Each structure stands twice: as C-alpha cells, then as structure tokens.
Amino acid sequence: NYKYLHYFFDHYRNRKLIKKDFPDEIWIENTNHCNAACVMCPRELQSRKKGIMDLDLYKKLIDEISLHKDVVKRLHMHNFGEPLLDKKLPLRIKYAKKKGIKHVYFVTNASLLTEKNSYDLINCGLDEFKISFYGVDKESYNNTMINLDFDKTLSNIINFFAIRKRLKSKQPKIILQLIPNSLTVNKVKEKWLNLFNKYIDHSIGDRFN
C-alpha cells in the first residue's frame, strides 16, 4: 500500500540519529513462522530458515538486556512472524518481566488468541500488545488476511476482553491497527468504531487515532 509506506517514510526520514551506548528499544523475534498470508506483507521474500528461538538463547539475551534495564524502554517480541505460534511466549514474557524489563510488547493477528492464551498473557505480566486487524467486515478481512477468519478472530478479541474484565486486570493494554483498503476513510472509521469502540484501549489507523 503506497499511501501507508509513504506515511512511514515521511515520519522517519527527518528523524535525527542519536548514537547511544545501548538501544532503548529492542526487538527479539521469537519466531518467524506465520499462519497468515496477508496480501501486503513481504515476509515470504525472506530467505532465512523458519523456526522458533531457543529458550536458553532467549534467556541469555534477556540477561544481557536486563543489565541495561534502566535504559531499555520497551522490548518488542515480534518481527516477521506470529508470536503466538510460540507456545513458550508467556514463559518468555514472564522471564523478561522477572528480570526487570519495563515494557514488554508484541504484535499479533489474534487468530490464536484462545482462552488459554488469553489467561496466560494476562497472568504472565505482558504490558501491551497490538492486534493487526485489516478489515472492517468479513469480506474485506478475509480477502486481506489470507488463511484467517474474520468471525473467529473477532470472537477471540471479544473473549479476551471478557476474560481480562473477569480477572479485574487492566493489563495487557490493547492497540488495534487497521489499514483501510478500497473503502473510503470515513466509511472505514464509522464501521471500525461501531465494531470495536467498546472493547479496545487504543487504536491506530489511517489518520484516525
């Protein structure tokens, strides 16, 4: 999507580079497997072998990061894969929080946000996650997020909020990301608000936040 890429290019190209002894935001890719084939995603172009990060290697990285926990503002647990395909994700998050990492975060398509995963993510100390939900109805969603199902994912999201409310927890916070397709922004905004407004904590999209 040219408009989407152009927005990020404009956003980052004029930012001043600052040299630091240790980065304040860190990405750890726990897996590069994904169960979706979104039409705009370039992940299939990657030549790297697909897999899940070894737990001992992960702990070694977290141990090193924890030495700079006063500097690190956020740990991103994602990159080209779907983090929830890693069954040890809650364990990894719990370890990072135990080591004093301030803010642990990841991006998911929420198709695997089952009841068990919902409980585990709430109880492991996760601070926040973003849901990529590219569609405002069954047709637009299923045509964009190939291999996933609109009704199932929507049900997962609604059930997650019900579980979080039942546990009387305010964490993790949820951000919903929506990328409009051929629909106009106003129509997308109206449908999107009707669909999610009573559930989400924050949202980002195409010029409406």
Predicted region positions:
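Radical SAM enzyme [4Fe-4S]-AdoMet core and its adjacent flexible, acidic
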Residues: 29, 51, 99, 119-209
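Conserved alpha-helical substructure of the radical SAM core
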Residues: 1-128, 143, 151-155
